[in-house]
Every structure is written in structure tokens, then in C-alpha cells.
């Protein structure tokens, strides 16, 4: 990234998803990462009318090699109607921030503001999340009953499809960055025994099937 002194923040940036190399489509949910040393002094006044949730200052994050990450804030924007990349980029540029990105899971993005589903990362305090513009934080932090039921179905399907035989293996996955939002919470807070028995029954079923195959081959 260019040094801040050489960046013309008035110039619109190209609409390109860095992962797919394709333009972002319009969407309701967007994310922006901002850095304290780049922010204008009145940055909260700039975003005050936008439906935004702001994370606590992430000043204790580390890279996989243990190197400390640059301090930053995560911003989650949730609109009632679709917004274009250009509209959100205008906000990002006013904050002297990198280009915005579309958010696929609003709940996951909001819970990531404090690493709720990433216990291997530093746990920030939900009480330090700030909201503006009528952002409904509580409904985003909590998984709905329907979300929990669907997530549990997805967890059981994952266990079967991947032939998970040990609770530890599944717990390790739930703690990883690849796991969907809420899985670690569902596993540890209310469903551990059920999932443990489900994994055990899968193992027993495979053992039974294996014995039958051996008998038929004798």
C-alpha cells in the first residue's frame, strides 16, 4: 500500500474483489478495516449517521508466526437496502481506510468484532463495541433459534460427511477460522454431550459395518 502522504483519498478506487478479481455486486452488508494513525480526528462524526458497528481497538492480535499485528478497528455496515461498492468506498476513503469488502455473513462479521467464535484469538469485550445509526447489535450477536437449529443440522452433516471419529477433532475444527460462525458456541454451551454421542454412534456404526464386511469375506 502506498504511504498515506501519497494517497489521494478523493480518487474513487476500482471495484474489484481481491479474492475473485471480479467486481462486487450491490449488497446490504459491508466491512471496512481502519487504522488509528490514519483516521481523521472527527472519524466518528463522519460515520455517526451510518448503520455501523465498530469493534474495540484490536491491539492484541498476532500473526500465525507470533508477530503482533498493526492495531486496527473493524467496522461492519448493515443497511436496509443494497449499496454499491462505490457508495461504501466513499465512506472508506473519508476514513482514509483500505477498500471496503462485501460481508457474506452479518452475524459472523459482528461476532468477529470481539472474536466470539475464535477462542484461539484474543477475546475482546462485547461491551466495548460501539454502534451508530440504529445498528441492531443484539440481534446480530445472538444466533436465532432457527439459526441454531440449522447450524446444528450443518454440524451433524459435517461430522458424517467427513467421518469425524473423535470429539477433539471436531472441537479443533470449530475453533478454527474455517468453521462457520456460532459452531464453537453451540458445541461448548449446550450440545457437547449430544454431539459426543452422535460422533460415538457414527464410530460404532462404522465398526459394525466393517465387521459385517469381514464376515462376508471369510
UniProtKB/Swiss-Prot annotation:
Residues 16-26 have a biased composition (Basic residues). Keywords: DNA replication, Plasmid. Residues 1-26 are annotated as: Disordered. It comes from the Bacteria. GO terms for cellular component: extrachromosomal circular DNA. GO terms for biological process: DNA replication. One of its GO terms (molecular function) is DNA binding. Signal peptide: none annotated. Is essential for plasmid replication. Nicks the positive strand at the plus origin of replication. Belongs to the Gram-positive plasmids replication protein type 2 family. This is Replication protein RepB. It comes from Lactiplantibacillus plantarum (Lactobacillus plantarum).
Amino acid at each position: 500500500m502506498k504511504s498515506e502522504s501519497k494517497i489521494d483519498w478523493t480518487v474513487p478506487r476500482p471495484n474489484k474483489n481481491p479474492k475473485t478479481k471480479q467486481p462486487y455486486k450491490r449488497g446490504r452488508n459491508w466491512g471496512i478495516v481502519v487504522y488509528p494513525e490514519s483516521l481523521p480526528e472527527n472519524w466518528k462524526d463522519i460515520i455517526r449517521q451510518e448503520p455501523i458497528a465498530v469493534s474495540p481497538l484490536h491491539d492484541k492480535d498476532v500473526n500465525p508466526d507470533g508477530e503482533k499485528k498493526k492495531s486496527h478497528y473493524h467496522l461492519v455496515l448493515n443497511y436496509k437496502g443494497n449499496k454499491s461498492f462505490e457508495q461504501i468506498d466513499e465512506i472508506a476513503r473519508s476514513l482514509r481506510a483500505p477498500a471496503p469488502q462485501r460481508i457474506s455473513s452479518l452475524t459472523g462479521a459482528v461476532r468477529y468484532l470481539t472474536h466470539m467464535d475464535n477462542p484461539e484469538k484474543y477475546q475482546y469485550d462485547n461491551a466495548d463495541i460501539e454502534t451508530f445509526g440504529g445498528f441492531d447489535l443484539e440481534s446480530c450477536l445472538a444466533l436465532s433459534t432457527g439459526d441454531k437449529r440449522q447450524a446444528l443440522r450443518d454440524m451433524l452433516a459435517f461430522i458424517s460427511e467427513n467421518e469425524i471419529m473423535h470429539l477433539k477433532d471436531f472441537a479443533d475444527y470449530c475453533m478454527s477460522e474455517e468453521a462457520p460462525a456460532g459452531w464453537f458456541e453451540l458445541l461448548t454451551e449446550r450440545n457437547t454431550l449430544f454431539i459426543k454421542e452422535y460422533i460415538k454412534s457414527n464410530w460404532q456404526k462404522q465398526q459394525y459395518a466393517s465387521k459385517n464386511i469381514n464376515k462376508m469375506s471369510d
